[in-house]
Design a protein with these regions (language model features):
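A short glycine-rich, Lys/Arg-flanked "PGG" loop and its adjoining helix->strand segment in the class I
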Residues: 133-145
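Class I (Rossmann-like) S-adenosyl-L-methionine-dependent methyltransferase catalytic domain
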Residues: 1-50, 57-108, 127-134, 148-209
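Structural signature of beta-strand start/N-cap positions in the alpha/beta core
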Residues: 53, 74, 114-116
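Conserved acidic functional residues
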Residues: 65, 112, 122
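S-adenosyl-L-methionine-dependent nucleic acid methyltransferase catalytic domains
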Residues: 115, 141-144, 184
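A short acidic, Gly/Pro-enriched loop at the edge of an enzyme's catalytic core
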Residues: 108-118
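A short SAM/SAH-binding and catalytic strip from SAM-dependent methyltransferases
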Residues: 117-130
Length: 209
C-alpha cells in the first residue's frame, strides 16, 4: 500500500519517524550515488549560479546541500523538520549562512527579491498541489528579477496508467499542471525534462522570474 506524504502533518510525522540510517543517500542509489546524482542531474543546470545567493527548500540531512554550499556565495536552507535543520547545521556549520525551520508551505524569513536560485530535490514529489502552489507564490516573492528555480516534482495522475506504479508516495502533479501554476504567478518555464526511476517517472522544471 502506498504511503501519502503530501499532507503537511503526514510529512512532518514521516520525517520524525524515518530512521535516516543512510542520511538519505539510499535515494541516490539509482543514479550511482549522491555524487553522480549531483554531477549528472543537477550541477549542469545550476552551475551558472556559482557565487550567487541560493535557497534550498527541504534539504533533509544535507545530501544536496553539501554541494550547494560550495557552489553558492550565500546559501540558505529551509525545512519543515527542526531535526533535519539541526543535523545539517552540525554537518555544514558556517558553510550555510541561514538555517530556517518553516511551516511546510512558506518561505518566511527569506527576504523579497533576495535569491538568484531556489532549488529543491526529492521533496516536491510528495507535496499536495495546494502546498506546491503556496511554495510557487513564495518562490516568486523571494527570487530576484531574472532569478531561476530548479524543482524536482512528480509526474503522476491518480487513475491513469501511472497510478499503479505509485509506490513512492507521489502526489498528483503533471508537467502541464506545474507549468500552469508557474504561469499563474507571471513566471516562465525555461527547461523541463523527465527523470526516470525504476518504479516512477518524475519531472524537473526550471523556471524564471
Amino acid at each position: 500500500m502506498e504511503k501519502n506524504f503530501y499532507n503537511i502533518d503526514e510529512q512532518r510525522r514521516w520525517n520524525e519517524d524515518y530512521m535516516w540510517e543512510r542520511e538519505g543517500h539510499e535515494w541516490s542509489e539509482v543514479f550511482g550515488g549522491t555524487e553522480n546524482l549531483w554531477n549528472k542531474e543537477i550541477f549542469p543546470y545550476v552551475k551558472e549560479f556559482r557565487n550567487k545567493n541560493i535557497l534550498e527548500i527541504a534539504p533533509g540531512r544535507g545530501r544536496i546541500t553539501q554541494f550547494l554550499s560550495v557552489l553558492a556565495s550565500e546559501l540558505t536552507v529551509i525545512d519543515l523538520n527542526p531535526t533535519c535543520i539541526e543535523i545539517t547545521k552540525n554537518k555544514l556549520g558556517s558553510h550555510v549562512k541561514n538555517y530556517i525551520v518553516n511551516d511546510g508551505k512558506s518561505l518566511t524569513g527569506v527576504y523579497n527579491n533576495s535569491m538568484d536560485l531556489v532549488i529543491s530535490w526529492d521533496s516536491f514529489v510528495h507535496m499536495h498541489k495546494n502546498v506546491i502552489e503556496e511554495y510557487i507564490k513564495e518562490i516568486y516573492r523571494v527570487l530576484s528579477p531574472g532569478g531561476k528555480s530548479f524543482i524536482h516534482h512528480s509526474w503522476f495522475q491518480q487513475g491513469s496508467e501511472y497510478s499503479t506504479n505509485n509506490v513512492a508516495g507521489r502526489s498528483n502533479m503533471t508537467p502541464e499542471l506545474f507549468t500552469e501554476l508557474i504561469n499563474n504567478y507571471g513566471m516562465k518555464v525555461v527547461h523541463q525534462f523527465n527523470v526516470s526511476f525504476p518504479e516512477v517517472t518524475d519531472t524537473i522544471t526550471i523556471f524564471q522570474k
